Amino acid sequence: KNGADLINDVSGFEYDPNTLLRLKKYNISKVLHHMQGTPNTMQKNPKYKNVLLDIYDFFELKIKKKLKNKKIILDPGIGFGKTLKHNLTLISKISLFHSLGFPILVGTSRKRFIGQISGGHDSKDRTGGTLASVLYLLSQGVQIFRVHNVNEIKQGILVFKKILLNQ
């Protein structure tokens, strides 16, 4: 109605059960975002049996039960209820989610895990780490990225692709 092409609900459509009902009449994409807990609790000792498989199962269940519309984009929720190890596991094994048959969106831009690895305490000093993660994820087939420094990341992607194609 107001021109939106995409809805991104960080709760995975859990906070307001009527959200999906209201969206049914609109032919727009829905980002299925994973977050353990709530924004207030998500970083308080997040635990998983197996972070990769737990999130895969979360996506699979949501797709089957609530999101029959095929306009779905998957977001594993880097930094949303995950430790450094969880984030690295998700990034390094992201290609597993392709088997669900939907585009993947990842937001690593300026995330805490980059600062934990590089020592960059100011989030604005994490562009290099953001670019490194985006290029790795791109090499694994991720189609959509949420970033802050659009020009720098776009330039990095263009150069990366040119080098790969060697043309």
Predicted regions and their residues:
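Active-site-adjacent loop and "lid" segments of alpha/beta metabolic enzymes
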Residues: 5-65, 81-167
